[in-house]
Amino acid sequence: MPNPKPRTTHPQITAGLRQFATQQKLTPNTVYSQFFREVFLAELMDTDPVWVLKGGTNLYCLIPGARHTQDLDLYRQTSPTSHRDAADALISAMHRMQVGPYTFEVRNPRKESVSGTIENIQLTVIVRFGTTEFSRFNIDVSGDLEAPTVTESLAVTRTDPLKVPFARQHFTVLSYPIENQLADKTCAMYEIHGTRGSTRYRDLYDIGLIALELEVDAEKLRTALEQQSRIRALTLPPRLVLPSDEWPAGYKKFVGTLHQPRPELRTVESALTTAEALLNSVLSLDNPITVGRWSPEQRQWSPQPKSPGPST
């Protein structure tokens, strides 16, 4: 295989991304957005390496080929950690950051929200080529999360194969613990806003995907579930169930929007069965698993191996 030719100019880069979009059966705008989000993320982690990646992009970094998301979800794990101050710190670090022929403008339209007691603020990033806006994406900045301190970096490879001298093909991120992400998604499935139940079909899909692909620590997951249910003031069911009668039709419609969904998760019944295998033993009130590791290959919990005792 010949080495890909370097692409340094805007026309060269966009031509390469369009070609990649055609190969992947994606729209050019989807690939443009993914490229610039990853370039931005690599620069942020290099400039201000105290940010932790969560949400769909975190899952995509852990499981290449996971569903695409259209924004970044981030939080700071060192001061300032409140959502407003953290957002200001991100703007200070990245506003008007130049990378190759592109400039990132980070704006704060003050779109704030609350999930339980977790406050978020949404920033908008505009990617300019010269003075022209070429792409844009959003960043959701969360404040004051209860989560373990992340110390180990996760190696990430940029999604596209282009050789772009100013855009790192490989970079590292701090990744939100998968047990906490599972707890967030489980609780979000049962959170009620107003009078309507949850319609977060993507969370069931993602829980199933985690069950198929990643190891999970039982003790850390139980701790995270207890924290999130307390923060959101909700009581989780003793086993995973569909939140409402809307879910079979709603989930089917959601899966229809995905690019190459996993065959094991195409129906709500198969997704629920896969997610149940991971979560029911932890949610159980009668005999919950408290120690062990989830094996995605075996799709079951295994006892945690004991540490070897002192040699005699």
Residue spans of the language-model regions?
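Structured mid-to-C-terminal alpha-helical surface segments
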Residues: 1-51, 60-70, 76-312
